[in-house]
Amino acid sequence: MPLLDSFKVDHTKMNAPAVRIAKTMCTPKGDNITVFDLRFCIPNKEILSPKGIHTLEHLFAGFMRDHLNGDSIEIIDISPMGCRTGFYMSLIGTPNEQEVSEAWLASMQDVLGVQDQASIPELNIYQCGSYTEHSLEDAHEIAKNVIARGIGVNKNEDLSLDNSLLK
């Protein structure tokens, strides 16, 4: 089985909240695809609650599109990490970490503006595979934490995992 890029970085050196360009690629037609690691929590020290990350998934995907999509950028997908320490965002385009950070921060402000559970998009049995597994309160706490701590940048060259540790 191939070793994925996300497992070639030293998680003990990651800062959070922080943006990292996880991968860049160019399609055969010449479109640039960028994958960002949006790290909300310090790996192995903090974790997002299941209900909080699920609610944030519903809110964050739309808010990030509101703040980042444009003529040269289109978000393909924003998905929570299985380890529950952040999200991966794949997009067409090449925004820099600062642009992504600003959109992320604005999105967290938007999350705080959601006043009740009924305002969470797609929160119903037809559009959500686990529609009872949500907490707006937890999502608000996550957003407050990101805003209070600020968003940094994780650089791949600073996180390179020594080959002796690769398994």
From Swiss-Prot:
Fe cation binds at H54, H58, C128. This is S-ribosylhomocysteine lyase. The gene is luxS. Its EC number is 4.4.1.21. It holds the Pfam family LuxS. Involved in the synthesis of autoinducer 2 (AI-2) which is secreted by bacteria and is used to communicate both the cell density and the metabolic potential of the environment. The regulation of gene expression in response to changes in cell density is called quorum sensing. Catalyzes the transformation of S-ribosylhomocysteine (RHC) to homocysteine (HC) and 4,5-dihydroxy-2,3-pentadione (DPD). It is an enzyme of class 4 (lyase). PANTHER family: S-RIBOSYLHOMOCYSTEINE LYASE (PTHR35799:SF1). The lineage of its organism: Bacteria, Pseudomonadati, Pseudomonadota, Gammaproteobacteria, Pasteurellales. Keywords: Autoinducer synthesis, Iron, Lyase, Metal-binding, Quorum sensing. One of its GO terms (molecular function) is S-ribosylhomocysteine lyase activity. Coiled coil: none annotated.
